[in-house]
């Protein structure tokens, strides 16, 4: 899926690990139909927003009720990091996969954001660090040798 080139990612990485097995065990065995529809609609909005560049939709599109509410209890300061990442100006923020890292979507080349994120970690969350990653719009390629 080609991603609109106006974004980068800031990843908040804690100094602890969370096993996928433990993260999966935190999830309920069954989900409510309403919750499934909620997440499916947001997944479609996320894909559409990332490909069209409608970045104003990313906060809503990164909303979740299937795994984040259950996994935040396993990620010390995780919910606070997501909230504060948005307060710093992230377009959206969420748990990366099973966790424990948190991903914030930011405007491409926003040096102010990464500086503020690093300062936030140093001052309030010393067990976390913030790292800026570029969006790879090509993905893995295989070339003939």
Language model regions located:
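Solvent-exposed alpha-helices and their adjacent loops that cap or buttress functional pockets
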Residues: 1-5, 38-39, 86-87, 94-96
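Residues embedded in well-ordered beta-strands
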Residues: 9-10, 101
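Active-site rim beta-loop-alpha module in soluble metabolic enzymes
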Residues: 10-73
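Glycine-rich, charge-dense phosphate/pyrophosphate-binding loop(s)
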Residues: 50-145
């Amino acid at each position: 899926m080609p991603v609109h080139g106006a974004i980068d990612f800031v990843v908040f990485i804690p100094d602890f690990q969370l096993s996928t097995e433990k993260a999966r065990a935190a999830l309920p065995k069954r989900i409510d139909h309403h919750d499934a529809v909620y997440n499916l609609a947001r997944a479609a909005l996320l894909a559409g927003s990332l490909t069209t560049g409608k970045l104003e939709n990313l906060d809503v599109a990164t909303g979740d009720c299937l795994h984040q509410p259950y996994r935040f209890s396993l990620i010390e300061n995780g919910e606070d990091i997501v909230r504060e990442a948005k307060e710093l100006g992230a377009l959206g923020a969420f748990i990366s996969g099973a966790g424990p890292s948190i991903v914030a979507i930011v405007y491409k080349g926003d040096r102010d954001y990464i500086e503020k994120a690093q300062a936030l970690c140093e001052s309030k969350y010393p067990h976390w660090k913030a790292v800026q990653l570029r969006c790879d719009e090509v993905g893995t390629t295989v070339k003939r040798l």
